[in-house]
C-alpha cells in the first residue's frame, strides 16, 4: 500500500517558470528547486527527502493538503488518487527509502514543460501558462503582476539534455502539457531525441487542445508512428457554446474534426469541472460516448473563485437531475460512473468564503467579457438571475 503519494519516488516536474515541484498541482511558492540548480541535484535534495520521510511517517505535506487531500474529503478524485492508481506497481520503491529520505533510483516519470506558448485564452488560465494572454493581460486586474513573455527553461538547456541522457534507461513515462505542446519546439526536439536514442518504448501522454495538428515542418503522425505507446487526453471544458465561451479561440468543429483524426491515440477527453463547464458536462459525456470516446472529469482545484461548489442550489439540483438521467440512459463502465459520482458529490458541498469568492469570480468574468465582447448571461441563461445578484 502506498503511503501518501507515489510521485516523490518516481516523478520529476519542471514547470513553466523553471521551478521544480512535486507535481503540476503544487503552487510555485512550494517548489523544491529551480532551473538555476543542476537538475541532477533536485530529486534527492533536502526538500524532496524531507517530503518523502513525512509521507512515510503518515504526515501530509502542507503543499499537498488543498490540492489533493481537501478534494478527497469532499468526495472529489484528487491527482494523488489518480497517480497512486496508475503507478501503484512502483509502491515497493518506498521500502528502499534511506533514513534521510533519499532514494537510489532515478526518476521514472518526467513532466517537463517546454514553455507557455499557446493559442487559447482560457478563462481558468492566464499569461503564466498561455502566450495568447500576453496582449490583453494588463487589462485584467489579477494578471497585472504576472510575467507576459515566452518562458522556456528546458528546450535549450544543456543541463536538461545531459541529465536526460544520464537517466534514459530509467525513464518510462513522459507527460506533455502546456501551454499547448503541439505548438512547442521542445516537444518535437524531445520526440526526435527519443527516436535517435532508441527510446521509443517510453510511454508518451499528452494534454492537448487539439486546435492544430500541424506545426512548422513537423509531421506529428510520422513521429508518433515510431513510438509504442501514445496516449492523448484532449481538453474540452463543457459542451459546444459553453466550452467556446470559457476557452477563447476554441472552435468545436475543429476540435471534433481533429479528435476523429487522432482517435486511435485518444485515451479519454479531459474536462475540468468548474462554474463554466459543469452545467453541460452531461451533454459532453453523452456526445463523446456517441463517438465511442470516454470523458474524464477533473475537479478544478485553483483558482478557487471558479469552483463549481459556488453554483446556486437550484442549479446544482438541475445538474444532479441531468446526471441521473445520463447514468440511466448511457452505458458507462464502473470507472466512468465512479468519476461522475465523485464530481457530483464534490459539487453538492458548500464552500467557505462563498460571497468573497463569488465577487472575485464576477469581477474577473466581467473584465474578460468586456475584453472578448461576450456575455455570461446570454451564454448561460439558466444562471442569469443568480449572476445578476452577485
Q: Model segments located where?
A:
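N-terminal pre-core extensions flanking Radical SAM catalytic domains
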Residues: 1-151, 167-169, 335-390
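Conserved C-terminal portion of the radical SAM core fold
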Residues: 17, 205, 227-236, 252-389
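Eukaryote-biased activation of long, low-complexity terminal tails and linkers
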Residues: 143-158, 169-174, 190-191, 196, ...
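Leucine-rich repeat
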Residues: 162-167, 191-197, 221-225
Amino acid at each position: 500500500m502506498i503511503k501518501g503519494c507515489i510521485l516523490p519516488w518516481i516523478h520529476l516536474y519542471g514547470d513553466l517558470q523553471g521551478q521544480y515541484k512535486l507535481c503540476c498541482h503544487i503552487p510555485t511558492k512550494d517548489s523544491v528547486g529551480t532551473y538555476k540548480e543542476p537538475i541532477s541535484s533536485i530529486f534527492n535534495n533536502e526538500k524532496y527527502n524531507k517530503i518523502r520521510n513525512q509521507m512515510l511517517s503518515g504526515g501530509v505535506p502542507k503543499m499537498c493538503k488543498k490540492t489533493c487531500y481537501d478534494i478527497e474529503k469532499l468526495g472529489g478524485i484528487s491527482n494523488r488518487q489518480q497517480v497512486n492508481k496508475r503507478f501503484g506497481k512502483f509502491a515497493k520503491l518506498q521500502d528502499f527509502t534511506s533514513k534521510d529520505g533519499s532514494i537510489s533510483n532515478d526518476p521514472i516519470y518526467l513532466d517537463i514543460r517546454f514553455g507557455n506558448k499557446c493559442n487559447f485564452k482560457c478563462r481558468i488560465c492566464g499569461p503564466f501558462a498561455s502566450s495568447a494572454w500576453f496582449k490583453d493581460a494588463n487589462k485584467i486586474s489579477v494578471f497585472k503582476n504576472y510575467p507576459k513573455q515566452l518562458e522556456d527553461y528546458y528546450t535549450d538547456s544543456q543541463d536538461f539534455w545531459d541529465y536526460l541522457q544520464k537517466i534514459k534507461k530509467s525513464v518510462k513515462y513522459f507527460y506533455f502539457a502546456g501551454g499547448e505542446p503541439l505548438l512547442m519546439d521542445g516537444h518535437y526536439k524531445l520526440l526526435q531525441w527519443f527516436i535517435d536514442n532508441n527510446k521509443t518504448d517510453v510511454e508518451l501522454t499528452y494534454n492537448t487542445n487539439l486546435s492544430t495538428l500541424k506545426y512548422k515542418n513537423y509531421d506529428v503522425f510520422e513521429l508518433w508512428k515510431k513510438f509504442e505507446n501514445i496516449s492523448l487526453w484532449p481538453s474540452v471544458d463543457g459542451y459546444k457554446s459553453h466550452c467556446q465561451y470559457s476557452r477563447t479561440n476554441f472552435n468545436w468543429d475543429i476540435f471534433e474534426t481533429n479528435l476523429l483524426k487522432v482517435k486511435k491515440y485518444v485515451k479519454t477527453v479531459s474536462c475540468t469541472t468548474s462554474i463554466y463547464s459543469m452545467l453541460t458536462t452531461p451533454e459532453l459525456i453523452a456526445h463523446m460516448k456517441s463517438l465511442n470516446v470516454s470523458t474524464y472529469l477533473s475537479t478544478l482545484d485553483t483558482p478557487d473563485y471558479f469552483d463549481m461548489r459556488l453554483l446556486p442550489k437550484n442549479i446544482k439540483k438541475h445538474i444532479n437531475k441531468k446526471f441521473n438521467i445520463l447514468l440511466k440512459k448511457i452505458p458507462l463502465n464502473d470507472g466512468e460512473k465512479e468519476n461522475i459520482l465523485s464530481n457530483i458529490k464534490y459539487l453538492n458541498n458548500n464552500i467557505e468564503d462563498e460571497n468573497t469568492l463569488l465577487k472575485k469570480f464576477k469581477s474577473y468574468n466581467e473584465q474578460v467579457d468586456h475584453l472578448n465582447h461576450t456575455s455570461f448571461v446570454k451564454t448561460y441563461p439558466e444562471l442569469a438571475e443568480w449572476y445578476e445578484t452577485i
